[in-house]
Amino acid sequence: MVQSTVELWQKNLHRAKQARDLVFDYALGTSLITLLPIAGYYSLRLLLVLFLLVKMCRDIGKIWQFPRGQDLLAIAGNIFGAIGAVITAAVVWVTLLAIGIWVPYFDSFKGFAGLFTLTWMLGQSTNQYYANGALGHRFHQPVQPDQESINHGHL
C-alpha cells in the first residue's frame, strides 16, 4: 500500500511531536535528580543520569524506527550537537554558580539548569539525526516510472 505524501508528513509531524515531548519529559526527570535532598551519592546520581540519557536516545530512535543511511553531515551534526550540549550545559552551570555568589540560594539550581540544558540539547540533536534518516529514505528516493507511462510517451 502506497501512502500519500500528506499522510507521510502527518505521520512524521506526529513522530516529531512525540520525540519533542519525550525529550522534555527526560529533561525534567534528569534535572529533578539534582534536587533530591540526599547528601553525597554523586556517583550514583551521575550513573542514573547517564543511564537516562542513553535510554532517551534509544527511545527517540524507537519513535523514528531506527532509520539507517544518514549522510555524513547528519552524523557530524549529531556528534557536534552532543559536544555543544555538554559545553552549553557547562556554561549554564558556571553562570548560575557565578550568579549565586551575589544572589543567595541561586547556585542551588545550577545542577538542575545544567542537566536540563544537557538533556534537552542532546535530545534535540538525536531527534534531528533520526528524523534526517527517516525523511531521507521516504522523500528523496527517485520515482520509478511504470512501463505504461513509458510506452505512451508520458515521460
Swiss-Prot record:
Location(s) in or outside the cell: Cell membrane
GO cellular component terms attached to this protein's record: plasma membrane
Entry's transmembrane regions: 33-53, 83-103
Keywords: Cell membrane, Membrane, Transmembrane, Transmembrane helix
Lipid bilayer topology: Multi-pass membrane protein
Protein family according to the UniProt entry: To E.coli YdgK.
Protein name: Uncharacterized protein sll0481
Protein source organism: Synechocystis sp. (strain ATCC 27184 / PCC 6803 / Kazusa)
